[in-house]
Amino acid sequence: MDLNRIIQALKGTIDPKLRIAAENELNQSYKIINFAPSLLRIIVSDHVEFPVRQAAAIYLKNMVTQYWPDREPPPGEAIFPFNIHENDRQQIRDNIVEGIIRSPDLVRVQLTMCLRAIIKHDFPGHWPGVVDKIDYYLQSQSSASWLGSLLCLYQLVKTYEYKKAEEREPLIIAMQIFLPRIQQQIVQLLPDSSYYSVLLQKQILKIFYALVQYALPLQLVNNQTMTTWMEIFRTIIDRTVPPETLHIDEDDRPELVWWKCKKWALHIVARLFERYGSPGNVTKEYFEFSEFFLKTYAVGIQQVLLKILDQYRQKEYVAPRVLQQAFNYLNQGVVHSITWKQMKPHIQNISEDVIFSVMCYKDEDEELWQEDPYEYIRMKFDIFEDYASPTTAAQTLLYTAAKKRKEVLPKMMAFCYQILTDPNFDPRKKDGALHVIGSLAEILLKKSLFKDQMELFLQNHVFPLLLSNLGYLRARSCWVLHAFSSLKFHNELNLRNAVELAKKSLIEDKEMPVKVEAALALQSLISNQIQAKEYMKPHVRPIMQELLHIVRETENDDVTNVIQKMICEYSQEVASIAVDMTQHLAEIFGKVLQSDEYEEVEDKTVMAMGILHTIDTILTVVEDHKEITQQLENICLRIIDLVLQKHVIEFYEEILSLAYSLTCHSISPQMWQLLGILYEVFQQDCFEYFTDMMPLLHNYVTIDTDTLLSNAKHLEILFTMCRKVLCGDAGEDAECHAAKLLEVIILQCKGRGIDQCIPLFVQLVLERLTRGVKTSELRTMCLQVAIAALYYNPDLLLHTLERIQLPHNPGPITVQFINQWMNDTDCFLGHHDRKMCIIGLSILLELQNRPPAVDAVVGQIVPSILFLFLGLKQVCATRQLVNREDRSKAEKADMEENEEISSDEEETNVTAQAMQSNNGRGEDEEEEDDDWDEEVLEETALEGFSTPLDLDNSVDEYQFFTQALITVQSRDAAWYQLLMAPLSEDQRTALQEVYTLAEHRRTVAEAKKKIEQQGGFTFENKGVLSAFNFGTVPSNN
């Protein structure tokens, strides 16, 4: 390869004027052998300009991630897709570790991503030598090679970070070499607090964290080595950050390597305590370790963390993530007596001076509110910000302490009450007090000591602050209303005030963060309080208009959810404004989708998705208003068109759901045109979305069968889609859906003249059965299509089976089909599939012109049917049982709980006692019961796609089968004897039960029909109702 030519092309990609020509040059060269190793040589060369090296690194990363592994050709194609040649791969393996060690940071980032992809595909099979190579550089006398080799080791460990313990053996073998090595290295580095030394220490900590985050490899750490590691973590957490760092701007300090190193050490100890060191909260393989951890390390580490919190209390700087992880660790310690004893004397100071301080409104909050209120909203509602926030961690610690340790809540409430009742207190502290009380709302509403005081608290301390001249206090007050929205109000006026103030804040407040909090509070009050819902009925239109305005301005997903919930609460009122609302939402969606930053901002995708869900909710609400639905259809079709035109595949699922909602009752000509458009999209890039298309396709078949059959193109489209799925590599779930659609078409069109389709459908599914099928669900679904064809027209199916010639199967396939069906009768699950199988077998046994294949399995037919009936009986019984259990659980849901642990007791002791008192039934048994329910219920996604056989007045499988047997008995006694001969006594008893039930069902159906013909049920007044009178006073007679 000509290196200079590649260098010039890479240089051209940086220049906008030359970019297209340069990219074309590279695209013509990348498949040439030695191209990828040439890129690596350019990357590591000090003689090449840095921007070119960086461009080469990005290009190589893209090549490796896309073209490294060997790939098979698509089904039906002989040409193998391109991948990097093995000679080139070996050259890269031989040199990439050195490349990472020698490269500057910005290039090194790209190369480590290459290495991760290579390790993922090649280790250990194709590249066991990577371990020796990393180890060689780790042991080097030159410290310059340590960081690069540690980064390589990190990629190795990260590759296995989320794998199950049994899949990590190659990593465990490697870490038997590396773990002692990096422990020794970090011990040597600890006394040196220079930038480079601490950078190396941080990287070692990151390796350890990735190793233990999801599984602790006990075979790598014994008590002695773990003690050394814990001492390392304790030392790093406890050591002083160089004082010169205080000269750096506070916003930049968390990124300093000394604070990051502390953060990772804390991250590790918090994770070890939470996942492996808390007895009573670990899986059985960690029982022994958890006891050892709690007794040996927990208190010592906590001592250091209490010191950190004291530093924060003394106004010394502590990085936010360090503070957050300290709170997380202490949160685990609250429930264990050994750590609680140490924490208990300090908990009041921690609560009042540290947690409270963190939960107050701060200078940085005020700065963001004033400079960019929309960014303030985004930050406050960002779940990822929450995850890393010291405020959230402080809130969680306080909540746990208040819930588990009885002395905490009264003292904290007294502290907050003092602040709220003193008019001279700093308003920011009032915000903190409200924040604390709102965070504890769930506990306060269950404690008899406090719950009756909460209404007075809202009246005296929250309602007035909703009118404060400080925006942040108004927002916090709305947040508190939200937190206490389930409160049982004794004074109706207070409830009315709460709702009116929330509405006023939503509609009239000028500050957007207040409006957002008010929206959430108002919706929560309406959902939890029946009277609140009534109060707001006259104001639905202005409320909805304001919510739409907020969404348009802020693009906040939480407010989109509020709109959805409000639509459900006020379905009748929303109907009158549905068109305007949908138009507004469509405009917001279009604006979001076409904004310049849409591609880069994930929040916008979530919010746009929320808008589509909201429009779908509106469609559901107005489904009975045909004239409104017709107007909404045009708006929705514009949205669907926009998404399809821009190929925004992440919204395909949502627009298909919209189309489904628009076709649930009738299908307009425009929606039939959409079928053709979707077919074109399906051909291009919607192949994997077939399962999402299925509900819509089902509607096309079942809602407007006349139009479906009026144009042969419609059925052709549906068949072609099913064929593409069943002949491609969409996966067996999609294939099951395709087979189901074919079955639905056959059953829906029985007697409607689709005879010409039956051979095509049957051949397609039986051909699929000749290729490898992994799941019984796909096997039975393919069989079910043929069974549906048997129900449609028995002679047509048998004729089709005789004519079909399958590859590698000489002669007709009737015998194979019948045998496969008989072998798989126990695989038909759920109600519909069993019913279909019973009807099919009943037709089979009643055939007059029976193929020899049926005679050959005569002894299996009736036993198989009886087995299927037994399965149906279990499904019905289990459904009734589950319904009863659901009602029972609902009744228990409102019981008050007391989870406090008496002063210094261990939570695990309390848990053990509770389990013993629960009739000896532990969690494992309960989980097994849940599994059993799922297994017997056998509900699948396919059960939801109804057919005419699933209607209440459809063919009854019990009557169908017994009638078939009676017919055979009277017509062909010899065949009847052959069918009955193999039955055991138990099976004959079961058969009699089926006969009895069939007769009962026939009698019930006839009685029901007779009543319907007479105009419905009439109830005679027998005096029963008059016996129940809840309004009268009993007499003394």
Swiss-Prot record:
InterPro entries: ARM-like, ARM-type_fold, Importin-beta_N, XPO2_central. It is linked to VISS syndrome: An autosomal recessive disease characterized by early-onset thoracic aortic aneurysm, aneurysm and tortuosity of other arteries, motor developmental delay, connective tissue findings such as joint hypermobility, skin laxity and hernias, and craniofacial dysmorphic features. Immune dysregulation has been reported in some patients. Involved in nuclear protein import, either by acting as autonomous nuclear transport receptor or as an adapter-like protein in association with the importin-beta subunit KPNB1. Acting autonomously, may serve as receptor for nuclear localization signals (NLS) and promote translocation of import substrates through the nuclear pore complex (NPC) by an energy requiring, Ran-dependent mechanism. At the nucleoplasmic side of the NPC, Ran binds to importin, the importin/substrate complex dissociates and importin is re-exported from the nucleus to the cytoplasm where GTP hydrolysis releases Ran. Keywords: Aortic aneurysm, Cytoplasm, Disease variant, Nucleus, Phosphoprotein, Protein transport, Transport. Residues 909-920 have a biased composition (Polar residues). Residues 886-895 have a biased composition (Basic and acidic residues). Changing Y317C: In VISS; uncertain significance. It is found in: Cytoplasm; Nucleus. This is Importin-8. Forms a heterodimer with KPNB1. Interacts with SRP19. Interacts with RPL23A. Binds directly to nuclear pore complexes. Interacts with LRPPRC; the interaction occurs when LRPPRC is in its RNA-free form and promotes import of LRPPRC to the nucleus to allow for EIF4E-mediated export of mRNAS from the nucleus to the cytoplasm. Residues 896-908, 923-934 have a biased composition (Acidic residues). SMART domains: IBN_N (SM00913). One of its GO terms (molecular function) is small GTPase binding. Residues 22-102 form the Importin N-terminal domain. One of its GO terms (biological process) is protein import into nucleus. The modification Phosphoserine is found at S902, S903. Residues 886-934 are annotated as: Disordered. GO terms for cellular component: cytosol; nuclear envelope; nucleoplasm. Belongs to the importin beta family. Gene3D superfamilies: Leucine-rich Repeat Variant (1.25.10.10). The keyword Nucleus applies.
